[in-house]
Amino acid sequence: MKYDIIIIGGGLSGLTAGITLAQAGRRVCIVSAGQSSLHFHSGSFDLLGYDVEGKPVTRPLEAIGQLGAEHPYAKIGFERIARLADEAETLLNEAGVKVKGDSKKNHYRFSPLGRRIPAWLTTDGYTVCEEADTLPWKRVEILNVQGFLDFPTEFISAGLKKQGAVCQVKSFTTDELRHARKSPTEMRATNIAKVLADRESLRKVADCINAVSGEADVLLLPAVLGFSDEKNLDELKTMVEKPIAYLPTLPPSVSGVRTAILLKRLFARLGGTLLVGDKANGGVFKDGRLVSVTTDHLPDEALYADQFILASGSFMSHGLESNYQRVFEPVFDLDVDAAGKRAEWTKEDAFDAQPYMEYGVRTDRDFHAIKDGQTVGNLFAVGSVLSGHNPVRLLDGTGVSLLTALQVARTITERR
């Protein structure tokens, strides 16, 4: 099979690149091995949350200019970041992932443990604050589904009380939710979202909430609605008498699953091909270019393309792997930026910046991958497979995924 572009990896960066290229009229195929790290998504997208010293960033576009030369943002070019950030927001909203935010100034989202964390874009309806030290309400009621353990209400309440809010924790249930509770494996956020997918179930939830809620400025609920779109989140707001807002839960993330579904739908509408549950396992190189790739489920048929994008993720997604001797990229054995000695991969203190978090595929300034010291002219790397940054310490992971994908897609479309 022959395509214009083949993308290896169906996560945030792979889908972003695929959508952008399909919109430009390219014939695109995405090879996706399985579920991506979007299933751990917070409901927010991060451009740059903390600087290199660990201090919260208020104005990310200004702080990005202080990052090192090997950071993916530096390779993009600091002068392009604002434009690409706007394009990323437009793409998400076009896919149906309704977000709000501003690349010029971070707002603050809530973690599932009640901490406030800098964020660039946040899903509509999720609880945010414009400032780090003020809350938009005084009296808060935190409402949880009975038996749902992935929404630690006591931690959230303690965090809000420290910031001056008067908090009450309450719970509710319905017959449908009570039935789901019989099996602990069914009390995950994504399973609850499926149980509450129809209007009748949603009406029962609203009636329960109206019955137990008191005199609060806002009702904070776990984000367990809207598995495939945001309709139920908005609909519940019209049914409940008090203002409500949603807080993220522990994984799996309903918002992340919904984001993946909506991006895949847009990619399919644009005519893209998605090979789901297949894994790229190698490629043929000739004269400094990648000619074709092979996959586990198509052992007798190579996939050919003019351009290739590696968006396979980091260690969690098996885009990077390691053994006792080395860190390596498993599909093409590309050059990797990593320490040679295993003892240097980690620090003894778990709270220190861990060196392995900055490991990734080595690229040139245009994100061409490098193999055996030589640039591969038609193979690009994007997203969390890239080296040069620590997404946990800098809180820039989703921003790097979105913006590097957009930049590489632009580079490819400008070649013709």
Language-model regions: role of each:
Residues 3-30, 409:
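N-terminal Rossmann-like FAD-binding beta1-loop-alpha1 element of flavoenzymes
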